[in-house]
Amino acid sequence: LQKSKYKVCGYVTDVEGNMDYFNKYVKISKILEWTCEKKNRLKFKKNDSIFIYGGDTQDRGDSDIRFVNILLKFKEDYPERVIFIIGNRDANKLRIPSEISEKYSNYQNFLKKYDNYPYWEDKSVRITLRKYLKDNNYDLNIKNRLKYIVERTMGNKDGFEKRRVELSIILKKNINNISDNDVISSFLNSVLPKPKNITQSNDNYMLKYLMQGQLVHIFGEHIFVHGAINEKNIGKIPKNKNTIEDIHIWAKEINNWFHKELKEYMKNPKDGGITKKRKAHNIINYAVPGYNKDITIVYADNLKNGNGVHINKNVIEHLNKYGIKNIITGHKPHGDCPLVIRDKNLTAISADTSYSNINYLKNIKDDKYYNDKRGKAVSEVLLYSNGDIRVHGILADNSKYGYIIKKNKKSPSSSDYIGLQLNNNYWVKNFKNNKYLISFGKGFDIDEKWVNLQELKKLLKKL
């Protein structure tokens, strides 16, 4: 392994345009802080650290543009020390130009093309453009097509109007003076090589993020992807039947593949509609579920029906062979603190906590956070060049926590149990006040309970 000149990496993921959450993260962060009270520019606290953003910058909050611009400025100030991982909510924005630019002469023929779209969704839950327009009594026009794309197929509820609000804030204009065309231009400009009407919307901030992003990054013994590394995708490059053995070469080659495809897209971003002819098709296809028997690292996960699963033994051996001992990901939420999955030779951490507000999930409306899926919870994962991992943050009940997983521990510690699966299939997720948080996921529901060491040891005994 090439020795890094940096000691520690700070990691957060899946902010999804939620500046309230990112502010909470900066407040607890050990490695970065705001430069001033305006909270629009970041700096490192020390010279020995780097920062990795784990992907998914967009869609769920009200600050998509502002959040990415903060990240871009941070990378401009520290180009070597700030790394962007590309998530599905980042890559899928390349769909917008070709889908809203497509012309049609026959209404019914145009809708018919969309009757099997989105192709990555099961027919039982798929909402087609035809159904969306009918259910909402909408006309077929660019505005409603964009609303369908953003709000229905990208999961950005009220995304069109949220963008209008954000533009009014950025441009310092009355919201009534932000037109539908301004909003359309905003989404379109975000991924165009040559954005237009910038003064009334924004520039190509998302394209800039993608141009500077990576699908894979390696820091010491830690490897970062948005989704997961498994037996289906390790060493795989899209459109290439060969498997790359060396993990470091694979990381380089899959990043090269992405940027080659992105350059092709930039030559002609608007043509092709929803067909395979559009230049971004390969990237779009790679960042959706079910791609080519799930060889994607962007949309994979370490869950089965919402609960953690052990990392494949062959994957562990393969990663270990090339000096990798930890996989750091986001993508799929799991409670109000990161999910840790440990084998004696590898630790996998999934740090997406975007569904951490239990009251929201249960729709309890007497909690002031009921309309916020995140609530009070926030976390930071710190990865050290010596292989150690530190996780700290605030839980949904507003209590603080923190633990360290040491690579070369000389004596037992309370964190030794974190990341183990119990005989009732619960995972040990946290430690606080001499008790352990154990958790079982089912879909987006999480059953959690605190147990003492004696209770934990009983659950660790083989049946």
What is the predicted role of each segment?
Residues 1-463:
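Feature recognizes metal-dependent phosphohydrolase scaffolds
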